[in-house]
Amino acid sequence: MSGNTFGTLFTVTTFGESHGPAIGCVIDGCPPGMVLSEVDIQPELDRRKPGTSRHVTQRQESDTVEILSGVYQGKTTGTPIALLIRNEDQRSKDYGNITETFRPGHADYTYWHKYGIRDPRGGGRSSARLTAPVVGAGAIAKKWLFEKYGTTFKGCMSQLGDIEIPFEDWRHVTENPFFSANASILPQLEAYMDDLRKNGDSCGARIDVVAENVPVGLGEPIYDKLDAEIAFALMGINAVKGVEIGAGFKSVAQKGTEHGDELTPEGFATNHSGGILGGISTGQNITASIAIKPTSSIRTARHSIDKAGNPVMVETLGRHDPCVGIRATPIAESMLALVLMDHALRHRAQCGDVVVTPPPIPGSR
């Protein structure tokens, strides 16, 4: 396999390039009989699409999704579901100056040495544009998980560059382009991004995601641990350089008396584990965070080399997100949903008949 397919029972294969005619995915393993149309998918794509504020790329894409297969009379058939999103606003001429050079921090150099050929237009296959079909597939997973278990997903930006964003309330997330759960800090975030753009620079971000009402028992005990699969999936998002589950790296400074989530008849007392123990879901909220590096394509000239190994200065002229993390929240939610969907089907296949008494205790949120 060449790494274009994700999942075991619920699989997603993406295709396309940033400046090709279209991008999309083929989803296999979706159970039959679920009511599904483009209306169920489009709102998630609209959360991610470019051109929604001055702080993201100004490439104008409607990201209108088309369902090509796998749905009949408004319901899934159990056969592969193909989603297509047509590219509408490519401007390939902006990349003429980097066809023979490598952008520092980008996949140009590694794609060239791996394949011996690369598509420089918008980064080709390595572009974050390819996260759109992932969000489309994630919308299907979210719908099935909600209808089956009541599982829901939410996320927010908790840090932009060196600015930490204290959590206030989830209701703020839908009210601003940063997916910030803090309304009072928005002027500071806007000023920071305006300054970055003016100086031709970029920054990173931290995104937190949560899955609620996750059933107990998802995940495998050794090599396909649920937290390992979540980390694998989240690391597959463009520009992600770090993943935390639950308390994550804060666990290093915690004592065992603090980190271990105590159990009572009324439920778990805390949730430092992030809702996963021994690679298997506890029924608590699953919590994860990702660290996203600064965007590699910037207008400031940087030292690099060309294909012949000669020193050059590289300046990227295309339309780019000065912070990829601003639009990453729905992407991270979708990847988490895809993992849980896959493991829900795997758990149902092997352990669907298992009955344990007493029932699971409530989880600390």
From Swiss-Prot:
What intrachain disulfides are recorded? none
Keyword set, alphabetical order: Amino-acid biosynthesis, Aromatic amino acid biosynthesis, FAD, Flavoprotein, FMN, Lyase, NADP
Task: Indicate the segments annotated as coiled coil, or none if absent.
Answer: none
Q: Which cofactor does it need?
A: FMNH2
Binding-site positions, NADP(+) = 48, 54
Query: What exactly does this protein do?
Result: This reaction introduces a second double bond into the aromatic ring system.
What is the protein named? Chorismate synthase
Q: Which gene encodes it?
A: aroC
